[in-house]
């Protein structure tokens, strides 16, 4: 039985969330009646309103109105007044992943999983499928610059979704194609231990039907190990590894562009397809790896090499993924969502390869628990930055942990041999600190999942305001 058009008004609690908003938008585009609520106004909320979706600010029982179905994310607490009211009315309460799974049943589905790189890879797969004329429906975990939104309603038979592993619900998604970019010990508050994370990703691939396939990164040791344990499913490997079925090589970085070749080898026939001189307007080996995953999917779906090259060259990127927010005095300023040591290291390596001058990193750690569990990894992930400014931890509702703060992290980074790590007491001092050290040709990269994105947006004008003043 498929999702009927007669389910009535669907109410989303927390509709402004990046995962919830995309599902709400696609449901609305399919002709369902949709409304929702969120704690605060936001760009996502306004975007949904512009499409005719009613959104209430604040959570109150009366917001449900005539709703017949309620959708919630795992972030919504049992004490939420709207959730309490829904259960009192005996309304069906649907988890975000369950509703996403229902939408996926209408299409052949590609689910992009992994602890890092999901959003960019989802966007790249969508871009290549669009270039190949497949007109996909897309639900992503970030704003795709070409769409100005995180969702796209297509007329084709394929759907591309980001599969969020954080709460285990990605295992509910009925994917025909499953992509795994990497596997790191994340979300242990939910899983309990790393073995449980490994088991979840194995099940994610093995859930694919016999006529589907998995696409797995051979450069990541955990994923390579998993490849050897998958039985009775077709697997396509990718990466820089010479043993990969779809391999990238001959990488050249030209400013903020990546130029590379890809070799596709068919195991059964021995056929080799070469894609030479591919251009992607985004730097970094991690992004080339993500692009190679997308190429593996696109090639398998029959998209021509010419369309793959055309789509890749047109890729407009994802909001908050090495996004240029402005320039000042020959200094380029970038905003990036990176908040895990693996992500930070990859972004700064890309900046180092692209930059003619020095790299200045500004980081706002996200959550005390993450900083505590990965303290040594954070201390070692900034080596490609010439200067580091560390802001206070963005708590995200957590209580402080004694001895775990940015001052301690600065001290640990310095003791590890870094020449210039400093504590940034608050955002108001950032323009002055940047102006004192930045020179023409330098990159300033602001990284984090908290409020730092607003600093990145404001910094170019703030620096202009300092021009003419003594610094």
From Swiss-Prot:
SUPFAM superfamilies listed in its UniProt record: MurCD N-terminal domain, MurD-like peptide ligases, catalytic domain, MurD-like peptide ligases, peptide-binding domain
Annotated keywords: ATP-binding, Cell cycle, Cell division, Cell shape, Cell wall biogenesis/degradation, Cytoplasm, Ligase, Nucleotide-binding, Peptidoglycan synthesis
Compartment(s) where it occurs, according to its Swiss-Prot or TrEMBL record: Cytoplasm
TM segment ranges: none
Positions bound to ATP: 114-120
Record's keyword annotation contains Cell division: yes
Name of the top EC class for this enzyme: ligase
GO BP, sorted A to Z: cell division; cell wall organization; peptidoglycan biosynthetic process; regulation of cell shape
Keyword Transferase: no
Pathway membership: Cell wall biogenesis; peptidoglycan biosynthesis
A GO cellular component entry from the record: cytoplasm
Principal place of residence: cytoplasm
Catalysed reactions listed for this entry: UDP-N-acetyl-alpha-D-muramate + L-alanine + ATP = UDP-N-acetyl-alpha-D-muramoyl-L-alanine + ADP + phosphate + H(+)
Xref: InterPro entries: Mur-like_cat_sf, Mur_ligase_C, Mur_ligase_C_dom_sf, Mur_ligase_cen, Mur_ligase_N, MurCDEF_pg_biosynth, UDP-N-AcMur_Ala_ligase_MurC
A Pfam entry, by short name: Mur_ligase
EC number per UniProt: 6.3.2.8
Functional summary from the UniProt entry: Cell wall formation.
Membership in a protein family: Belongs to the MurCDEF family.
Protein name: UDP-N-acetylmuramate--L-alanine ligase
Organism: Rhizobium johnstonii (strain DSM 114642 / LMG 32736 / 3841) (Rhizobium leguminosarum bv. viciae)
Protein's gene: murC
């Amino acid at each position: 039985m498929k999702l009927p058009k007669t389910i009535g008004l669907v109410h989303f609690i927390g509709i402004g969330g990046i995962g919830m908003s995309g599902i709400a938008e696609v449901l609305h585009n399919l002709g369902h009646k949709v409304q929702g609520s969120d704690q605060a106004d936001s760009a996502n909320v306004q975007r949904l309103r512009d499409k005719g979706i009613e959104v209430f600010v604040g959570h109150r029982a009366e917001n449900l109105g005539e709703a017949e179905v309620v959708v919630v994310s795992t972030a919504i607490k049992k004490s939420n007044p709207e959730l309490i009211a829904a259960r009192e009315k005996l309304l069906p309460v649907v988890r975000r992943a369950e509703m996403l799974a229902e939408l996926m049943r209408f299409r052949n589905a590609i689910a992009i999983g992994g602890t890092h790189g999901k959003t960019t890879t989802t966007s790249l797969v969508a871009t290549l499928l669009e270039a190949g004329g497949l007109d996909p429906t897309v639900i992503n975990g970030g704003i795709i610059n070409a769409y100005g939104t995180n969702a796209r309603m297509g007329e084709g038979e394929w759907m591309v979704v980001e599969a969020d592993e954080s709460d285990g619900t990605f295992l509910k998604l009925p994917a025909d194609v499953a992509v795994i970019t990497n596997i790191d010990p994340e979300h242990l508050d939910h899983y309990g231990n790393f073995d449980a994370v490994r088991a979840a990703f194995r099940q994610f691939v093995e859930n694919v039907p016999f006529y589907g396939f998995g696409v797995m990164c051979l450069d990541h040791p955990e994923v390579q190990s998993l490849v050897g344990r998958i039985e009775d499913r077709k697997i396509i490997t990718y990466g820089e590894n010479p043993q990969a079925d779809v391999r990238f090589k001959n990488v050249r970085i030209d400013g903020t562009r990546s130029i590379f070749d890809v070799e596709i080898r068919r195991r059964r026939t021995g056929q080799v397809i070469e894609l030479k001189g591919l251009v992607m307007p985004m730097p970094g080996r991690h992004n080339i790896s993500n692009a190679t995953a997308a190429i593996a999917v696109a090639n398998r779906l029959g998209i021509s090499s010419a369309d793959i090259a055309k789509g890749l060259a047109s890729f407009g990127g994802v909001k908050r993924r090495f996004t240029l927010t402005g320039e000042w005095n020959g200094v380029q300023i970038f905003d990036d969502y990176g908040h895990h040591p693996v992500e930070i290291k990859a972004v700064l390596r890309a900046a180092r390869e692209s930059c003619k001058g020095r790299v200045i990193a500004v980081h706002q750690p996200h959550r005390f628990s993450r900083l505590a569990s990965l303290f040594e990894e954070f201390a070692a992930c900034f080596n490609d930055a010439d200067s580091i400014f560390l802001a206070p931890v963005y708590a995200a509702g957590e209580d402080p942990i004694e001895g775990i703060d940015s001052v301690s992290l600065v001290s640990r980074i310095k003791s590890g041999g870094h020449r210039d790590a400093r504590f940034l007491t608050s955002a108001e001092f950032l323009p002055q600190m940047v102006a004192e050290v930045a020179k023409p040709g330098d990159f300033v990269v602001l990284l984090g999942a908290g409020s730092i994105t607003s600093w990145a947006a404001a910094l170019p004008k703030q620096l202009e305001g300092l021009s003419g003043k003594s610094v």
